[in-house]
Amino acid sequence: MAWKNGWKAACGALLMLAALSPSPAPAQVPDDVLVVGQIAEPKSLDPHAVTATNDFRILMNLYDGLVRFRSGTLEIEPALAEKWEISPDGKTYTFTLRRGVKFHDGTPFDAEAVKFNFDRMLDDKHPQHDTGPFPLAFFFSAVERTEAADPRTVVFHLKEPYAPLLSNLAYPTGLIVSPEAVRKGGKDYGRKPVGTGAYRFTEWQSNTKVVVERNPDYWNGAPKLQAVIFRPLTDANTRLTELLAGGLDLMVEVPPDAVDLLGKAGGFKLHEQAGPHLWFLILNTREGPFKDVRVRQAINYAIDKEALVKGVLQGTATVADSIVPAAFEWAHDDKLQPYPHDPDRARALLREAGAEGAELKFLVAEGGSGMLAPVPMATAIQADLAKVGLKVTIQTYEWNTYLGLVNQGLAGKGDMAEMAWMTNDPDTLPFLTLRTEALPENGGFNSGYYSNPEIDKLLLQARQSTDRDARAELYRQVQRIVREDAPWAFVANWKQNAVTTERVQGFELQPSFLLNLAHVSKAAQ
């Protein structure tokens, strides 16, 4: 494949240049500073205002939540809350807060601060609600009200039982911001973030870097590093060049061919971690050819997903079979099979639907969180669809521009769009993207306008059930119906990766796809 050979040639040339060039000066990156190569510029440093893992990787180091994911797992453990109790009816969660914690601006972390955070997101009459929008406030839609019972006790009163609450509180949308900083910053708060985390914000130079520095008073022990610099490098070749030249200590989302070549170069460590990731195509079910379920099914048959994961992704992913990634073992339907590659079946469905030779506009990101190799993936998909007679035009966009476009819905913009989600609970992705109430005009992420009342009912039942086995069966029903309705083309589940220099110590990738640098250090030159 031309794209593959081109990337390999580029990587090979970069490695040759690195070998011929003198070694970088030891002072280029100080021993107590970590430089991270990110895939894009962050949209905001307000955890309640963003949706991208690219942004979350920074935010997890500036803020804490009431709870967090235990390292190496998706299990919940205490963070800013020391402990919690759940009422027998599952509708009241009472959290006891950690003593003596302060925000980076010196203001106290207490129950009133927690109440402020959730009221700001959920109450449209709150004085700081206009500092939004808050696209993932859906995570806490079951919360009727929050109560600061005393300075160290905060109570969440729910409208109904809500099984994913603790998991959602551990997600970046549950991170706690300084109320005083929000009041001072207003709509610009996302450029001047203040949390309780291991690092505190120093500066943000647009399209150049975000700098955070060590919080010496961190409640969980001060970091070993003095600072972390996050550099937005959207081009994979540029990230690789910087890594080889000594300008980066850590590179996230490494292209498959680069992984192989970096291994040969020496001096680097590869980190891999499986997690609940899904790469898919959103199909516009409101207008155009994809209004017909037969055309949506045809797309799923036409795309050679095995070739994509083995070729474009070099075996770093598996073929996706449903909306619930297999990483959620307890909820995934193991009996469900991916759509097989069957061009003849695809052509037959297109004939039945009267969609032979249809012209499709395909929206594609140039990069982005979990998007893998979006342009090569799109080019390969375009070729597969051409083989069944479909004429696909690709239009590419910068990541944040792309998110803004696609999240508002595909109507009037395109027929299909790439997307990737990394989730924390089987509820998250379908509830935010496939319910009728999650249409873009309602503030949700159902950008393809899929609507099925049975799915709406099952998802509501699943999130209200406190019996894990009952929830699992409901999610299996959802998977079977969604596979048949085919509102998306299900493509790949990715195993995330990162590369560090051998000097970096204490770094681990997490199944949550988040980046925790509190315990990372660097060996001296």
Give the residues covered by each predicted segment.
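N-terminal lobe/hinge region of extracytoplasmic solute-binding protein
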Residues: 37-88, 119, 126, 192-194
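Gly/Pro-rich hinge or "lid" segments in bacterial periplasmic/extracellular proteins
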Residues: 70-71, 162-223, 227, 237, ...
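Aromatic- and charge-enriched surface segment that lines or borders ligand/interaction sites
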Residues: 82-127, 155, 242, 289-291
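Surface-exposed binding/hinge segments that line
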Residues: 96, 115, 133-180
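Ligand-site clamp/hinge motif
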Residues: 190, 215-261
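Structural transition elements
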Residues: 319-352, 369-376
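Extracytoplasmic/peripheral linker and loop segments enriched in polar/acidic and small residues
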Residues: 387-404, 431-502, 524-525
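Long beta-strand-rich cores associated with HINT superfamily self-processing modules
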Residues: 498-525
